[in-house]
């Protein structure tokens, strides 16, 4: 084994050949050298592990194709496009919502050009970045005032820090949710300086539970919408309207965190009823917060709406500077919100809303079109079929609720297994993510555009050929 190490090429000789072949054109010399060193380290480990056992395995004709693949893979951007064939619309691991075309255009312009981010074009003086979206948000939701921060966790943090720091916030025990990434409402509350006062039981909380807990240290009544899980059976929760009435009786602000939140009524899709932001604001809840990049279909943002006196207080919190949104988020959010001025336009132009509301008959046609593309590209290397299935909204919204869809199934006819196909597709360019059901690799056209069908076929062909 030890003799095999001497047949490994030198770094400089490898770099020379890579340059001659044009493999590292445009790459910094240091990056190229690091990639080559990394590949040679892999070869050394393979010699030690008994994977490379013969001199011919280290010949240039054998090593160079592997090296080329290694270098090209290492030179690719780490953050890149992925084809989402999972059918999960707001896939939190694949970037959440897709932006509308107008929002993409607005972001591009904001990046490439100077703008009136904090400049009042009427007076020629300094302006507020929030002026670009506050009026829009209020018009759509019916709220008196609004503020946008960088995500909904920040919205919860700054709201609690402003309205309840050093005092108690009363919350139902059944609403102490974990919002993802191991971040929990009690932890956020602790960080804000507010003290948690739990009331009720896990499955049932009554209005009198809140009222009995009110004391001289109470600063806030809080309701957390459990959008990412369901408690079913013997349950009871207090509505935002009831809590708002109790708050007025005791001169206490009421805050509702809607989580994913939505501006669209999705009734008629077979999904359980979820309150819209407009409905919660209409219940006279003082402060409401929700996400911008989930069911709403915009960029990552935390949107806070409500009574002007409370929103103004939150705006003045020094923490607002630390959690404010940047110009790209602002541009994307304004463009997205403008689409919501007409609900039908939003359903048509906001990709997230369009995908959620797509009719099953249209999805069947899309699945058939995708299947035809795959058959043309793959030939006899795989059996392609279409069958009924389910999609999910994702993003912590409508948990355990299914949307009817049609899946395209791929079963390799050769030596590649379904599991190997799924794993191999993660390394194609672009990577393709799907799911395995009933011994078949499945693609859901709900989360794929027609322009991506050929890319899916080419990716699968790379693994099967």
Swiss-Prot record:
The modification N6-(pyridoxal phosphate)lysine is found at residue 294. Its EC number is 2.9.1.1. Its main location: cytoplasm. GO terms for biological process: conversion of seryl-tRNAsec to selenocys-tRNAsec; selenocysteine incorporation. GO terms for molecular function: L-seryl-tRNA(Sec) selenium transferase activity. One of its GO terms (cellular component) is cytoplasm. Keywords: Cytoplasm, Protein biosynthesis, Pyridoxal phosphate, Selenium, Transferase. It holds the Pfam family Se-cys_synth_N. Pathway: Aminoacyl-tRNA biosynthesis; selenocysteinyl-tRNA(Sec) biosynthesis; selenocysteinyl-tRNA(Sec) from L-seryl-tRNA(Sec) (bacterial route): step 1/1. It comes from the Bacteria. Its cofactor is pyridoxal 5'-phosphate. SUPFAM superfamilies: PLP-dependent transferases (SSF53383). It catalyses: L-seryl-tRNA(Sec) + selenophosphate + H(+) = L-selenocysteinyl-tRNA(Sec) + phosphate. It is found in: Cytoplasm. Converts seryl-tRNA(Sec) to selenocysteinyl-tRNA(Sec) required for selenoprotein biosynthesis. Belongs to the SelA family. This is L-seryl-tRNA(Sec) selenium transferase.
């Amino acid at each position: 084994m030890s003799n095999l190490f001497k047949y490994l090429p030198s770094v400089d000789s490898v770099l020379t050949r890579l340059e001659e072949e044009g493999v590292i054109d445009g790459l910094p010399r240091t990056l190229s050298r690091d990639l080559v060193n990394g590949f040679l380290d892999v070869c050394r480990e393979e010699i030690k592990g008994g994977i490379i056992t013969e001199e011919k395995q280290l010949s240039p004709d054998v090593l160079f194709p592997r090296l080329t693949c290694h270098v090209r893979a290492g030179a690719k951007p780490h953050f890149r496009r992925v084809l989402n064939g999972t059918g999960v619309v707001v896939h939190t691991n694949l970037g959440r919502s897709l932006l509308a075309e107008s929002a993409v255009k607005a972001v591009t312009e904001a990046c490439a050009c100077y703008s009136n981010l904090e400049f009042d074009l009427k007076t020629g003086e300094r302006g507020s970045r929030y002026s670009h979206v506050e009026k829009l948000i209020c018009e759509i939701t019916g709220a008196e005032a609004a503020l946008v921060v960088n995500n909904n966790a920040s919205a919860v943090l700054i709201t609690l820090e402003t309205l309840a720091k050093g005092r108690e916030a009363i919350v139902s025990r059944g609403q102490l949710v974990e919002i993802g990434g191991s971040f929990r409402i009690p932890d956020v509350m602790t960080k804000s300086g507010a003290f948690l006062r739990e009331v009720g039981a896990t499955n049932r909380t009554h209005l009198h539970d809140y009222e009995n807990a009110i004391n001289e240290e109470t600063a806030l009544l809080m309701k957390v919408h459990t959008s990412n899980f369901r408690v079913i059976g013997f349950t009871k929760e207090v509505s935002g309207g009831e809590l708002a009435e109790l708050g007025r009786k005791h001169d206490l602000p009421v805050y509702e965190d809607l989580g994913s939140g939505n501006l669209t009524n999705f009734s008629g899709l077979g999904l359980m009823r979820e309150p819209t932001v407009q409905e919660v604001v209409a219940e006279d809840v003082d402060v409401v917060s929700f996400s911008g990049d989930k069911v709403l279909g915009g960029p990552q943002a935390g949107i806070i709406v409500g009574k002007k006196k409370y929103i103004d207080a939150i705006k003045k919190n020094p923490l607002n500077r630390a959690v404010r949104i940047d110009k790209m988020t602002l541009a994307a959010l304004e463009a997205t919100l403008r689409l919501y001025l007409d609900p039908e336009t939003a359903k048509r132009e906001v990709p997230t809303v369009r995908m959620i509301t797509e009719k099953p008959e249209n999805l069947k046609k899309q699945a058939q079109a995708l299947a035809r593309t795959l058959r043309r590209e793959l030939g006899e290397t795989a059996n392609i079929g279409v069958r009924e299935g389910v999609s999910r909204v994702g993003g912590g919204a409508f948990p355990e609720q299914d949307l009817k869809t049609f899946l395209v199934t791929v079963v390799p006819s050769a030596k590649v297994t379904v599991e190997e196909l799924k794993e191999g597709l993660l390394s194609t360019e672009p990577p393709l993510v799907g799911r395995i059901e009933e011994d078949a690799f499945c693609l859901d056209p709900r989360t794929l555009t027609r322009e991506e069908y050929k890319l899916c076929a080419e990716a699968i062909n790379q693994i099967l050929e």
